Amino acid sequence: MKLYERLMTIDRRIIYGILLGVVTLPLIFPSVVKVTPMSPVEKLFTAVDNTTNDKALILDCSYSPQIKAEVEPMAIAVLRHAFKTRKKILVLSLYVEMIGLATRAINQVVEEFNSNAQTYEDSLIYGRDYVFLGWQPPPIVPMLGMGESISNIYVVDYYGNQTDTLQMMERIRNYNDISILVALSGSRIPISWVAYAQNRYGLAVGVGCTAVSGADFYPYYQTGQFTGLMVGMKGAAEYEELVEANYGVKGRRVASEAMLSLTYAHLAIILFIVIGNIGFFLHRRRK
Amino acid sequence: MKKTIPLTLIFIAGLLGVISFVIPHPSYQVYDEWIRNDLLRVLSAFAVVLALGSLLRVHFDKIKRKRKNWQFSWLLLIAFGGSAVVGLFGGVAADGVLPTAVGSFQFDIQTLYENIVIPLASSMFALLAFFMASAAYRAFRVRSMEATLLLVAAFIVMVGVLPMGYSISKHLPGFVQWILNVPNVAGQRGIVFGIALGVVATSLKIILGIERAWLGGGE
Amino acid sequence: MNISTDPWIWISSILSLAILSFLYKENPFFRAAEHIFLGVANGYLVTFYWHRILMPILFRPLFQQGQLLLIIPFTIGILYLTRFIPRISWLVRIPIAIYMGYWTGVLIPATIQAQIIKQVQGTVLTSANFQSWNAGAWGIVWSVIVFIGVLCTLSYFYFSREHKGVIGVTSRVGIVFVMIGFGAAFGYTVMARISLLIGKLQFLLGDWLGIIR
């Protein structure tokens, strides 16, 4: 077998094995990687930070289980940030298959905070500090309807409570009482938030998306339709870094832990492409 | 009648949708809110009943006719039946009439979701990393100027966006951000315009009854 | 190494491995896991549609609180089920027409505003756009590049005339921008796919086998 043939016909099992190796080893033998936040993430962080006491923040956890690894760290980082700075927060999902992930993220972060709380005031109290609105279909209903009345759309919350009886909801009636909506998604949902809620009610929209959508979303970030943008696991790691650096919130940083594996895997993929192309050039030259 | 009524309805409903956006007057908003909050919400729920009915019918049919791999349809039906009973009678937040724990072992609907749906769905997508690596190695060939540009841009983003970008050069992450903000925005925006015009044209065709594929086959 | 003793973690891990076994080839374990996924996911869906939509939005207000206007959506919704009765199955078109019609109707102005007008505003050469880059005089250069890039990209997708002469030149420039955009998207896609694999391994090696923290 000629060299170029060898270079062009590496068995897929070897490729799978190398990829598995370069991803696994840095997880088993981790080392610290410094993550430097980029401006789109910093802008999102600042926008969440600037939420005033009289307003609330909406976190839309519309990411499916398939992309949990990329987007869940974003949800956890934003929740840690919001809870640490005592922002009022409403959580929702636009699709039913995603609501369990929102439940998971809320339970995890609330438990983190409440296990360290000394007093009732320090604790995160449901209905006082946060409300889990749950889910109402189809997405256009909450997107437009919350502009008029949040409790008309979410008559009952996730737990089955009448939403308008919750303490926090006395002051939070519609988008006028919302500083920013952070849409975490793996689809075009953030664009729908802009098209419906922002166009009609002027709602500020910040976005956390999978890396697949990252490049597509930049035109909306450039126009200011998206206040800030977190892209993929790296975006999540940047937000984790900002939360820890600015507020000293300690907790497992799943996205940051993955940076070394991600780096080696990228290098491996580049190497695969280069090897394939070297074989291709040698082959073409012979022809 | 079988086509005229649906086509008239879609025209009227489409018009109501457009009006709701163009005339955000409170007197009209009351009706618009009723359409969205009551009508659309209930319709979406019944649409799910239809989808589920179709899914179950396909699998019952598969079992009845003993089609290829029919045994697996039993698994689907048992998994569906079991989780539906747990969810319907055990409640959304384990607050129903059915007990959802035996000792410390919980089996409420959220537990089923976290331990069955999430791992299965995430594993399916984890497979893609292997296929993507293999496909990139086999198919990504620098045959033209366009392919070279694509490859160079991809490599710069792959290297520069990660923490190693800073190690190579402190200017590299900034350069990647520039690529994403400037040339990428220009290229993507051209595509955004194309998609948006396509969406508007298709929507108009549906409302005006020119596009009728949604009617399905038959009379 | 600190292997989990939680039975659910074991179930999750075994199901995950069944799916990952597809890497070798399609097999009965993969198929079984796939069918279990569909079953449980739909059971979950039914739970929420019943407890959070049909009960609080339709049945309770209609039958307990006497909101009779809800008979209209209820009746139209029932028409979805005529799909299973061949003689009157055409009636399923009525709820589809209303649902789809309203949705597409709202979509038209929303798309024009968000994806055409606002995007044009972000492209034209105005002082506000120059300043939005926060890059001083370079902001003008970046805005000009975006402006030219968008026009050239559009000319590349303009197929009503042959790509010769001026359009030939602009479309060649346009393809450069498109390819840079696709390249960036590809780079990010690699990151996305690898991230999902990392997530899976973090679960298997961490939560299950306890090899990593």
PLM segments and residue spans:
Chain A
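Alpha-helical transmembrane signal-anchor/signal-peptide segments
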Residues: 33-50
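Short extracytoplasmic
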Residues: 45-73
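Short, aromatic-rich amphipathic segments at membrane interfaces
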Residues: 225-228, 232-263
